[in-house]
């Protein structure tokens, strides 16, 4: 079932001639999620990812590919793109029909969902790691590696039955192996070449501090926000001098709409011990010049500014009063 999409992808992703390799491991993978509500109603979703960046998707209403980046077509021609879209339309129709016919054989009950992921990862030096996995209702079902279908323990007899069935079709297995070990890396390199400028950019992070909800009386939650950085790897830690604070809690690195990233790191401390703490940020775009923000400095600055503004307002009122009073004396 899940292998049918890979057989089609072998046609969709022709080999490229890109020879330059990125120094860091990076992967391209396709995900599929198919929801079967009853014997006549199913819905398919698919997307293609370059690492953590979604570069294309599938519009199930129009039956067309959504290229989310100007460079995500790689070196494909318009004719090849049209062919891809037609093959995907045929695939999804066939996939739904085949699954619905095998519902009883594989002991499936409506509603259910099938997920699949397949792709390849390139390492420096040209090493290739390919992968293909399938799941039902979020549970690992099977995987394919080196001409072997490996049923997952949680897949039970259904997974064993599927592997026994698919391995009878050596032609499909040959296509899948070729796709994962040869075609996928070449397509990946084509996209990397087309998107080199965007993928190799370095954007400096912005950082600021705030106070979160108090975890308990007498405590403060210190929050360090880091946003707008690219690439994704970043190091954020609360410090006291040069001593890392192991109680620092890092959230997930979340995407911004502009393909940069956001992260927050929190630290719960006794209120009277907050003085002297700082947040340190390390990122490749900073050239070794870490961002260091000290807790309390911003608050002191605002207090000083508020006092200065207040004094200025009082002085202004005094000058106006004096001017009016002096003018009144002149009239008399």
From Swiss-Prot:
Disulfide-bonded cysteines: 120-184, 149-163, 224-279
Molecular function per GO: endogenous lipid antigen binding; exogenous lipid antigen binding; lipopeptide binding
PROSITE patterns, per the entry: IG_LIKE
A cellular component annotation (GO) from this entry: extracellular space
Protein's UniProt name: T-cell surface glycoprotein CD1b2
Pfam annotation, one family: C1-set
Keywords, ordered alphabetically: Adaptive immunity, Cell membrane, Disulfide bond, Endosome, Glycoprotein, Immunity, Immunoglobulin domain, Lysosome, Membrane, Signal, Transmembrane, Transmembrane helix
Cellular compartments annotated: Cell membrane; Endosome membrane; Lysosome membrane
Residues annotated as signal peptide: 1-17
Transit peptide in keyword set: no
Membrane protein topology class: Single-pass type I membrane protein
Gene3D superfamilies, per the entry: Immunoglobulins (2.60.40.10), MHC class I-like antigen recognition-like (3.30.500.10)
Classification via CDD domains: IgC1_CD1 (cd21029)
UniProt topological domain (Extracellular) ranges: 18-301
The encoding gene: CD1B2
Known partners and oligomeric status: Heterodimer with B2M (beta-2-microglobulin). Interacts with saposin C.
One record GO biological process: adaptive immune response
Species per Swiss-Prot/TrEMBL record: Cavia porcellus
UniProt motif Internalization signal: location: 328-331
Ig-like domain boundaries: 185-295
Domain of life, per lineage: Eukaryota
Topological domain ranges for the Cytoplasmic compartment: 323-332
